[in-house]
């Protein structure tokens, strides 16, 4: 909820949710009806040759990968047609496996679905073995393997990634990169204009910069971490990387490398949710950040911030000039479920509730624990029978995963 004084009743919120679900349902139905009408018109491809090129391209655009392959082997003309229409691929992930030298590549056709395939590239003497498992609802999993003779597994995995990037005209929405030695100089990837969700598991800063520069300036979700979390203190991201628009404009920003984010850079971020090393951010800056939210001057839709690697944090300095309500025994009795959910989400330490000046029924939680200061919007203004009240909501209800504890 925004911090502008607006509020909705629980009934209204439930109605909004039902409308969204109904809208998505009918959009899917409309798409299915459209595809079925096309299939009926072409008579199960019996009238395929009667369609003009534009109609054929439209049909191919909606085909899944298996159907595209089946159509492509019908004729040379169909083969060229299929290859000329970009494939719908949601995301591509590729990463090195460090326990056993290999590269894992995953091609995801739809978001959060089983429509994907995963391959493992391994070296076997002078050859490359490509392994995958075929799953079935009724049969036992089948393991498959093909061999590319006189080849190197790393190079073959790169060729595969480049090939599939080209198949979708570099239009993926999600990318997960975990190959520090990816050959950037010879890559054909120039731009990934549709990418909104990015995970870079890299310790090479040049690789981080190279991949970020391929992304659009406004992204939804960005994770940058070393290859393993044991290495999170071994590499420090340079200040110039932290000023890239791909970072400053990102809605959800998670940085697990060491960073030297300054007070000024902290206030430049547009993130609604963020987590990063904040050893250079002063207590006075955190105080100002909280006051901005109290007075409705923070990032619109702000949800939470985890500020890590703070050797010392002065509670009095951070809360100076701010009215706070400690989470004492009375607060715990009044909000037992919320207290339990919050503690499960991020380990509650010394917690304080802070109300908004715009709408006092909106509030945030300030949490001090170990080497971290975390800030969460948890109190939402609601109405019941026309009477306003505060509904406390645990951050886990609006977060897709718990933050990594550095």
UniProtKB/Swiss-Prot annotation:
Superkingdom, natural source: Eukaryota
User: What Pfam families is this protein classified in?
Assistant: F-box, FBA_2
- InterPro entries assigned: F-box-assoc_dom_typ2, F-box_dom, She-1-like
Q: What name does this protein carry?
A: Uncharacterized protein K06H7.2
* Highest classification ranks of the organism: Eukaryota, Metazoa, Ecdysozoa, Nematoda, Chromadorea
